[in-house]
Amino acid sequence: MQQTKKLTHSDITIAVMSGPFLQRGEPALVSKWYRTKMALACGVDLVVELPYAFSTQKAETFANGAISILNALHVSEICFGSEDGQIENFYNTISVQKNEEETFNRLVKQFMNAGNSYAKATSEAFLHILSSEKNIDMSQPNNILGFQYIKAILMQNSSMQAQTIKRFASHYHDETFNDQHIASATSIRKQLFSENSSFTEIESFIPKATASLLASYKQNYGTLHNWEQYFSFFKYKLMTMSPENLRHIYEIEEGLEHRILSKIQTSSSFHSFMESLKTKRYTWTRLQRACTHILTNTTKEEIYCANIEQHAPYIRLLGMSQKGQTYLSKNKKKIELPILTHTKTFDHPTLHIERKANSVYFSIMKEPLRTQLLKRDATHHPIRYDETTAKFL
Protein backbone atom coordinates (compact mmCIF):
# COMPACT_ATOMS: atom_id res chain seq x y z
CA MET A 1 0.00 0.00 0.00
CA GLN A 2 2.74 2.47 0.97
CA GLN A 3 4.71 1.60 -2.17
CA THR A 4 1.61 2.19 -4.30
CA LYS A 5 1.04 5.63 -2.80
CA LYS A 6 4.71 6.50 -3.24
CA LEU A 7 4.72 5.35 -6.88
CA THR A 8 1.46 6.99 -7.96
CA HIS A 9 1.38 10.12 -5.72
CA SER A 10 -2.35 9.44 -5.41
CA ASP A 11 -4.82 11.84 -3.84
CA ILE A 12 -7.01 8.94 -2.74
CA THR A 13 -6.70 5.17 -2.88
CA ILE A 14 -9.54 2.88 -4.01
CA ALA A 15 -9.59 -0.89 -3.54
CA VAL A 16 -11.87 -3.26 -5.48
CA MET A 17 -12.38 -6.28 -3.25
CA SER A 18 -13.95 -9.70 -3.82
CA GLY A 19 -16.98 -10.63 -1.75
CA PRO A 20 -17.44 -13.96 0.06
CA PHE A 21 -15.64 -16.12 -2.53
CA LEU A 22 -12.31 -15.40 -4.22
CA GLN A 23 -10.79 -15.72 -7.67
CA ARG A 24 -9.02 -18.96 -6.75
CA GLY A 25 -12.41 -20.51 -6.00
CA GLU A 26 -12.26 -20.53 -2.21
CA PRO A 27 -14.09 -18.76 0.61
CA ALA A 28 -12.53 -15.60 2.01
CA LEU A 29 -10.95 -16.10 5.45
CA VAL A 30 -13.29 -13.52 7.01
CA SER A 31 -16.33 -11.57 5.86
CA LYS A 32 -16.02 -8.66 3.45
CA TRP A 33 -16.92 -6.27 6.25
CA TYR A 34 -13.93 -7.30 8.35
CA ARG A 35 -11.69 -7.14 5.27
CA THR A 36 -13.05 -3.66 4.54
CA LYS A 37 -11.96 -2.58 8.02
CA MET A 38 -8.51 -4.04 7.36
CA ALA A 39 -8.21 -2.08 4.12
CA LEU A 40 -9.36 1.21 5.66
CA ALA A 41 -7.01 0.81 8.63
CA CYS A 42 -4.13 0.24 6.19
CA GLY A 43 -4.72 3.44 4.23
CA VAL A 44 -7.40 2.72 1.61
CA ASP A 45 -9.94 5.53 1.19
CA LEU A 46 -12.72 3.74 -0.70
CA VAL A 47 -13.50 0.02 -0.66
CA VAL A 48 -15.94 -1.32 -3.26
CA GLU A 49 -17.05 -4.88 -3.96
CA LEU A 50 -16.30 -6.92 -7.07
CA PRO A 51 -19.48 -8.98 -7.66
CA TYR A 52 -19.35 -12.79 -7.51
CA ALA A 53 -20.06 -12.98 -11.27
CA PHE A 54 -16.60 -11.43 -11.80
CA SER A 55 -14.65 -12.34 -8.67
CA THR A 56 -14.87 -16.13 -9.13
CA GLN A 57 -13.77 -16.10 -12.75
CA LYS A 58 -10.67 -16.53 -14.90
CA ALA A 59 -8.23 -13.61 -14.91
CA GLU A 60 -9.69 -11.97 -18.03
CA THR A 61 -13.24 -11.71 -16.64
CA PHE A 62 -12.01 -10.79 -13.15
CA ALA A 63 -9.94 -7.94 -14.62
CA ASN A 64 -12.76 -6.69 -16.87
CA GLY A 65 -15.08 -6.36 -13.89
CA ALA A 66 -12.52 -4.62 -11.68
CA ILE A 67 -11.41 -2.16 -14.37
CA SER A 68 -15.00 -1.30 -15.30
CA ILE A 69 -15.69 -0.32 -11.68
CA LEU A 70 -12.49 1.72 -11.37
CA ASN A 71 -13.21 3.39 -14.70
CA ALA A 72 -16.71 4.32 -13.54
CA LEU A 73 -15.18 5.86 -10.41
CA HIS A 74 -12.91 8.00 -12.65
CA VAL A 75 -9.70 6.48 -11.36
CA SER A 76 -6.65 7.89 -13.17
CA GLU A 77 -4.12 5.20 -12.26
CA ILE A 78 -4.09 1.52 -11.31
CA CYS A 79 -1.27 -0.22 -9.46
CA PHE A 80 -0.78 -3.97 -9.09
CA GLY A 81 1.89 -6.35 -7.83
CA SER A 82 3.66 -8.59 -10.34
CA GLU A 83 6.56 -10.99 -10.60
CA ASP A 84 8.00 -8.90 -13.46
CA GLY A 85 7.88 -5.42 -11.96
CA GLN A 86 8.38 -3.50 -15.25
CA ILE A 87 5.20 -1.96 -16.67
CA GLU A 88 6.74 -1.51 -20.15
CA ASN A 89 7.11 -5.28 -20.44
CA PHE A 90 3.35 -5.74 -20.01
CA TYR A 91 2.57 -3.36 -22.86
CA ASN A 92 5.23 -5.03 -25.02
CA THR A 93 3.69 -8.45 -24.39
CA ILE A 94 0.20 -7.21 -25.29
CA SER A 95 1.58 -5.73 -28.51
CA VAL A 96 3.31 -9.00 -29.46
CA GLN A 97 0.16 -11.04 -28.78
CA LYS A 98 -1.91 -8.67 -30.91
CA ASN A 99 0.56 -8.87 -33.80
CA GLU A 100 0.82 -12.66 -33.53
CA GLU A 101 -2.85 -13.27 -32.72
CA GLU A 102 -3.47 -15.89 -35.41
CA THR A 103 -0.36 -17.89 -34.46
CA PHE A 104 -1.13 -17.50 -30.76
CA ASN A 105 -4.71 -18.81 -31.09
CA ARG A 106 -3.53 -21.74 -33.21
CA LEU A 107 -0.91 -22.67 -30.60
CA VAL A 108 -3.43 -22.46 -27.73
CA LYS A 109 -5.75 -24.82 -29.60
CA GLN A 110 -2.85 -27.15 -30.39
CA PHE A 111 -1.72 -27.36 -26.75
CA MET A 112 -5.29 -27.85 -25.49
CA ASN A 113 -5.81 -30.67 -28.00
CA ALA A 114 -2.73 -32.28 -26.45
CA GLY A 115 -4.62 -32.45 -23.15
CA ASN A 116 -3.32 -29.32 -21.42
CA SER A 117 -5.46 -26.95 -19.36
CA TYR A 118 -6.36 -23.60 -20.90
CA ALA A 119 -3.98 -21.85 -18.49
CA LYS A 120 -1.10 -24.17 -19.40
CA ALA A 121 -1.91 -23.94 -23.12
CA THR A 122 -1.83 -20.13 -23.06
CA SER A 123 1.39 -20.13 -21.06
CA GLU A 124 3.03 -22.46 -23.62
CA ALA A 125 1.70 -20.40 -26.53
CA PHE A 126 3.23 -17.26 -25.03
CA LEU A 127 6.57 -19.06 -24.64
CA HIS A 128 6.54 -19.74 -28.37
CA ILE A 129 5.68 -16.21 -29.54
CA LEU A 130 7.67 -14.21 -26.96
CA SER A 131 11.40 -14.08 -27.52
CA SER A 132 12.54 -10.74 -26.08
CA GLU A 133 13.59 -10.12 -22.48
CA LYS A 134 11.26 -7.13 -22.62
CA ASN A 135 8.24 -9.43 -22.36
CA ILE A 136 6.72 -10.88 -19.21
CA ASP A 137 6.68 -14.48 -18.01
CA MET A 138 3.07 -15.52 -18.62
CA SER A 139 3.34 -18.60 -16.42
CA GLN A 140 3.34 -16.41 -13.28
CA PRO A 141 -0.09 -15.72 -11.68
CA ASN A 142 0.37 -12.03 -10.87
CA ASN A 143 1.87 -11.32 -14.29
CA ILE A 144 -1.18 -12.97 -15.88
CA LEU A 145 -3.63 -10.87 -13.86
CA GLY A 146 -1.67 -7.66 -14.50
CA PHE A 147 -1.61 -8.46 -18.23
CA GLN A 148 -5.40 -8.78 -18.16
CA TYR A 149 -5.81 -5.51 -16.22
CA ILE A 150 -3.95 -3.63 -18.94
CA LYS A 151 -5.84 -5.45 -21.71
CA ALA A 152 -9.11 -4.45 -20.03
CA ILE A 153 -7.99 -0.81 -19.83
CA LEU A 154 -7.24 -0.83 -23.55
CA MET A 155 -10.43 -2.73 -24.48
CA GLN A 156 -12.60 -0.32 -22.48
CA ASN A 157 -10.89 2.71 -24.08
CA SER A 158 -9.98 4.00 -20.65
CA SER A 159 -7.48 6.80 -20.07
CA MET A 160 -6.32 5.01 -16.92
CA GLN A 161 -2.56 4.59 -16.56
CA ALA A 162 -1.01 1.42 -15.14
CA GLN A 163 1.87 0.93 -12.70
CA THR A 164 3.29 -2.25 -11.21
CA ILE A 165 5.33 -3.12 -8.13
CA LYS A 166 7.66 -6.10 -8.22
CA ARG A 167 6.82 -8.90 -5.82
CA PHE A 168 9.92 -10.35 -4.24
CA ALA A 169 10.98 -13.04 -1.75
CA SER A 170 7.59 -14.79 -1.84
CA HIS A 171 5.46 -16.07 -4.72
CA TYR A 172 1.65 -16.23 -4.61
CA HIS A 173 1.48 -20.02 -4.29
CA ASP A 174 4.43 -20.46 -1.87
CA GLU A 175 3.30 -22.55 1.11
CA THR A 176 6.09 -21.69 3.58
CA PHE A 177 7.30 -18.50 5.24
CA ASN A 178 10.73 -17.03 4.54
CA ASP A 179 13.06 -15.02 6.78
CA GLN A 180 12.40 -11.69 5.08
CA HIS A 181 9.04 -10.94 6.75
CA ILE A 182 7.21 -11.47 3.46
CA ALA A 183 4.65 -14.25 3.03
CA SER A 184 2.27 -15.40 0.32
CA ALA A 185 -1.50 -15.54 0.85
CA THR A 186 -1.23 -19.32 0.49
CA SER A 187 1.37 -19.69 3.26
CA ILE A 188 -0.63 -17.47 5.64
CA ARG A 189 -3.78 -19.53 5.03
CA LYS A 190 -1.87 -22.76 5.55
CA GLN A 191 -0.46 -21.51 8.85
CA LEU A 192 -3.84 -20.32 10.13
CA PHE A 193 -5.40 -23.75 9.57
CA SER A 194 -2.47 -25.85 10.77
CA GLU A 195 -2.63 -27.81 14.02
CA ASN A 196 -2.10 -25.71 17.15
CA SER A 197 -1.89 -22.58 15.01
CA SER A 198 -1.89 -19.15 16.59
CA PHE A 199 -1.84 -15.63 15.25
CA THR A 200 1.64 -15.02 16.67
CA GLU A 201 3.21 -16.99 13.78
CA ILE A 202 1.81 -14.59 11.18
CA GLU A 203 1.99 -11.28 13.05
CA SER A 204 5.33 -10.30 11.51
CA PHE A 205 3.99 -10.93 7.98
CA ILE A 206 0.80 -8.83 8.05
CA PRO A 207 -0.20 -5.34 9.29
CA LYS A 208 -1.01 -5.07 12.99
CA ALA A 209 -4.60 -3.99 12.27
CA THR A 210 -5.11 -7.04 10.01
CA ALA A 211 -3.83 -9.45 12.68
CA SER A 212 -6.05 -7.83 15.29
CA LEU A 213 -9.17 -8.05 13.09
CA LEU A 214 -8.46 -11.69 12.14
CA ALA A 215 -8.23 -12.57 15.83
CA SER A 216 -11.38 -10.56 16.55
CA TYR A 217 -13.36 -12.39 13.83
CA LYS A 218 -12.34 -15.79 15.15
CA GLN A 219 -13.19 -14.79 18.70
CA ASN A 220 -16.59 -13.32 17.75
CA TYR A 221 -17.69 -16.02 15.29
CA GLY A 222 -15.66 -19.03 16.41
CA THR A 223 -14.06 -19.70 13.04
CA LEU A 224 -12.17 -18.56 9.98
CA HIS A 225 -13.50 -19.82 6.64
CA ASN A 226 -11.95 -22.52 4.47
CA TRP A 227 -13.21 -25.20 2.09
CA GLU A 228 -13.18 -28.06 4.61
CA GLN A 229 -15.93 -26.41 6.65
CA TYR A 230 -18.24 -26.55 3.64
CA PHE A 231 -17.29 -30.06 2.54
CA SER A 232 -20.12 -31.99 4.27
CA PHE A 233 -22.75 -29.79 2.63
CA PHE A 234 -20.85 -29.86 -0.67
CA LYS A 235 -20.69 -33.67 -0.64
CA TYR A 236 -24.35 -34.03 0.32
CA LYS A 237 -25.29 -31.66 -2.51
CA LEU A 238 -23.32 -33.68 -5.07
CA MET A 239 -24.65 -37.01 -3.79
CA THR A 240 -28.19 -35.80 -4.51
CA MET A 241 -27.44 -34.43 -8.00
CA SER A 242 -27.68 -36.21 -11.33
CA PRO A 243 -25.20 -35.61 -14.18
CA GLU A 244 -27.97 -33.67 -15.94
CA ASN A 245 -28.41 -31.38 -12.91
CA LEU A 246 -24.68 -30.84 -12.64
CA ARG A 247 -24.32 -29.94 -16.30
CA HIS A 248 -26.40 -26.80 -15.67
CA ILE A 249 -23.81 -25.47 -13.22
CA TYR A 250 -21.46 -22.81 -14.54
CA GLU A 251 -18.00 -24.07 -15.62
CA ILE A 252 -19.07 -27.73 -15.71
CA GLU A 253 -18.04 -28.67 -19.24
CA GLU A 254 -16.79 -31.54 -21.39
CA GLY A 255 -18.07 -34.37 -19.22
CA LEU A 256 -16.50 -33.00 -16.03
CA GLU A 257 -19.76 -33.79 -14.22
CA HIS A 258 -19.11 -37.55 -14.49
CA ARG A 259 -15.62 -37.26 -13.02
CA ILE A 260 -16.87 -35.07 -10.16
CA LEU A 261 -19.72 -37.45 -9.27
CA SER A 262 -17.36 -40.42 -9.41
CA LYS A 263 -14.60 -38.92 -7.23
CA ILE A 264 -16.91 -37.52 -4.54
CA GLN A 265 -18.08 -41.04 -3.63
CA THR A 266 -14.76 -41.99 -2.01
CA SER A 267 -13.58 -38.59 -0.74
CA SER A 268 -13.55 -37.84 2.98
CA SER A 269 -12.27 -34.26 2.76
CA PHE A 270 -12.23 -31.44 0.26
CA HIS A 271 -8.47 -31.71 -0.12
CA SER A 272 -8.59 -35.44 -0.87
CA PHE A 273 -11.43 -34.82 -3.32
CA MET A 274 -9.40 -32.18 -5.16
CA GLU A 275 -6.31 -34.38 -5.24
CA SER A 276 -8.30 -37.15 -6.91
CA LEU A 277 -10.14 -34.76 -9.25
CA LYS A 278 -7.29 -32.72 -10.75
CA THR A 279 -5.83 -33.70 -14.10
CA LYS A 280 -3.42 -32.28 -16.63
CA ARG A 281 -6.37 -30.64 -18.37
CA TYR A 282 -7.95 -29.06 -15.29
CA THR A 283 -5.90 -26.92 -12.90
CA TRP A 284 -6.60 -26.89 -9.17
CA THR A 285 -7.83 -23.30 -9.36
CA ARG A 286 -10.14 -23.98 -12.31
CA LEU A 287 -11.66 -26.95 -10.47
CA GLN A 288 -12.03 -25.00 -7.22
CA ARG A 289 -13.99 -22.34 -9.08
CA ALA A 290 -16.27 -25.02 -10.54
CA CYS A 291 -16.75 -26.42 -7.02
CA THR A 292 -17.62 -22.95 -5.74
CA HIS A 293 -20.34 -22.66 -8.39
CA ILE A 294 -21.68 -26.08 -7.35
CA LEU A 295 -21.69 -24.99 -3.71
CA THR A 296 -23.55 -21.76 -4.51
CA ASN A 297 -25.73 -23.44 -7.16
CA THR A 298 -24.72 -20.86 -9.75
CA THR A 299 -25.96 -21.94 -13.16
CA LYS A 300 -24.82 -21.10 -16.68
CA GLU A 301 -28.13 -19.35 -17.28
CA GLU A 302 -27.71 -17.16 -14.20
CA ILE A 303 -24.23 -16.06 -15.25
CA TYR A 304 -25.50 -15.39 -18.77
CA CYS A 305 -28.36 -13.26 -17.38
CA ALA A 306 -25.88 -11.35 -15.21
CA ASN A 307 -24.17 -10.25 -18.46
CA ILE A 308 -20.63 -10.94 -17.33
CA GLU A 309 -19.35 -10.07 -20.80
CA GLN A 310 -20.49 -6.52 -20.09
CA HIS A 311 -19.21 -4.18 -17.41
CA ALA A 312 -20.17 -4.32 -13.74
CA PRO A 313 -23.82 -3.18 -13.43
CA TYR A 314 -23.43 -1.31 -10.12
CA ILE A 315 -20.90 -0.26 -7.47
CA ARG A 316 -21.42 -1.69 -3.98
CA LEU A 317 -19.74 0.67 -1.55
CA LEU A 318 -18.33 -1.21 1.46
CA GLY A 319 -16.33 1.44 3.27
CA MET A 320 -14.78 4.90 3.12
CA SER A 321 -12.42 7.20 4.94
CA GLN A 322 -13.25 10.88 5.43
CA LYS A 323 -11.14 11.63 2.36
CA GLY A 324 -12.96 8.92 0.39
CA GLN A 325 -16.33 10.32 1.39
CA THR A 326 -15.28 13.78 0.19
CA TYR A 327 -14.16 12.32 -3.16
CA LEU A 328 -17.52 10.59 -3.66
CA SER A 329 -19.45 13.74 -2.77
CA LYS A 330 -17.49 15.78 -5.32
CA ASN A 331 -17.71 13.21 -8.12
CA LYS A 332 -21.08 11.53 -7.52
CA LYS A 333 -22.81 13.23 -10.46
CA LYS A 334 -20.08 12.09 -12.87
CA ILE A 335 -20.31 8.42 -11.85
CA GLU A 336 -22.66 6.70 -14.28
CA LEU A 337 -23.12 3.39 -12.44
CA PRO A 338 -25.54 3.26 -9.49
CA ILE A 339 -23.71 3.36 -6.15
CA LEU A 340 -25.28 0.99 -3.62
CA THR A 341 -24.87 1.74 0.07
CA HIS A 342 -27.04 -1.32 0.81
CA THR A 343 -28.76 -3.98 -1.30
CA LYS A 344 -32.12 -4.25 0.39
CA THR A 345 -34.15 -2.53 -2.35
CA PHE A 346 -31.94 -2.89 -5.45
CA ASP A 347 -32.70 -5.63 -7.97
CA HIS A 348 -30.40 -7.12 -10.62
CA PRO A 349 -29.52 -10.68 -11.79
CA THR A 350 -25.93 -10.10 -10.62
CA LEU A 351 -27.22 -9.29 -7.16
CA HIS A 352 -29.36 -12.46 -7.08
CA ILE A 353 -26.17 -14.49 -7.43
CA GLU A 354 -24.50 -12.34 -4.76
CA ARG A 355 -27.27 -13.06 -2.25
CA LYS A 356 -26.94 -16.80 -2.80
CA ALA A 357 -23.18 -16.62 -2.34
CA ASN A 358 -23.61 -14.73 0.93
CA SER A 359 -26.16 -17.29 2.16
CA VAL A 360 -23.74 -20.14 1.50
CA TYR A 361 -20.79 -18.27 3.00
CA PHE A 362 -22.57 -17.81 6.33
CA SER A 363 -24.13 -21.30 6.30
CA ILE A 364 -21.36 -22.68 8.55
CA MET A 365 -22.47 -20.34 11.36
CA LYS A 366 -24.88 -21.51 14.03
CA GLU A 367 -28.34 -20.07 14.39
CA PRO A 368 -29.47 -17.43 15.20
CA LEU A 369 -26.11 -15.89 14.20
CA ARG A 370 -26.42 -17.15 10.61
CA THR A 371 -29.74 -15.39 10.02
CA GLN A 372 -28.54 -12.23 11.76
CA LEU A 373 -25.43 -12.02 9.56
CA LEU A 374 -27.43 -12.55 6.36
CA LYS A 375 -29.96 -9.89 7.28
CA ARG A 376 -27.20 -7.50 8.29
CA ASP A 377 -25.35 -8.01 5.00
CA ALA A 378 -28.28 -6.73 2.93
CA THR A 379 -28.88 -3.69 5.14
CA HIS A 380 -25.26 -2.98 6.11
CA HIS A 381 -24.28 0.59 5.31
CA PRO A 382 -20.70 1.45 4.33
CA ILE A 383 -18.14 1.36 7.13
CA ARG A 384 -16.81 4.82 7.90
CA TYR A 385 -13.29 5.50 9.11
CA ASP A 386 -11.66 8.66 10.42
CA GLU A 387 -8.06 8.46 9.27
CA THR A 388 -7.02 11.43 11.44
CA THR A 389 -7.94 9.62 14.67
CA ALA A 390 -7.56 6.06 13.29
CA LYS A 391 -11.05 5.20 14.54
CA PHE A 392 -14.14 3.66 12.95
CA LEU A 393 -17.21 5.88 13.17
Swiss-Prot record:
The alphabetized list of GO BP terms reads: tRNA modification
The record ties this protein, via SUPFAM superfamilies, to:
Nucleotidylyl transferase
Q: Binding positions for ATP?
A: G81, N142, R167
Q: Name one GO cellular component term.
A: cytoplasm
Q: What is its EC number?
A: 6.3.4.-
Q: Does the keyword tRNA processing apply?
A: yes
Q: Which family does it belong to?
A: Belongs to the TmcAL family.
Q: Which EC class does it fall in?
A: ligase
Provide the GO MF annotations for this entry. Answer: ATP binding; ligase activity, forming carbon-nitrogen bonds; tRNA binding
Function in brief: Catalyzes the formation of N(4)-acetylcytidine (ac(4)C) at the wobble position of elongator tRNA(Met), using acetate and ATP as substrates. First activates an acetate ion to form acetyladenylate (Ac-AMP) and then transfers the acetyl group to tRNA to form ac(4)C34.
Q: Check the record and name the NCBIfam families matching this protein.
A: PRK13670.1
Localization recorded for this chain is: Cytoplasm
- Protein name in the entry: tRNA(Met) cytidine acetate ligase
Give the UniProt keywords, A-Z: ATP-binding, Cytoplasm, Ligase, Nucleotide-binding, RNA-binding, tRNA processing, tRNA-binding
Question: What chemistry does it catalyse, as a reaction equation?
Answer: cytidine(34) in elongator tRNA(Met) + acetate + ATP = N(4)-acetylcytidine(34) in elongator tRNA(Met) + AMP + diphosphate
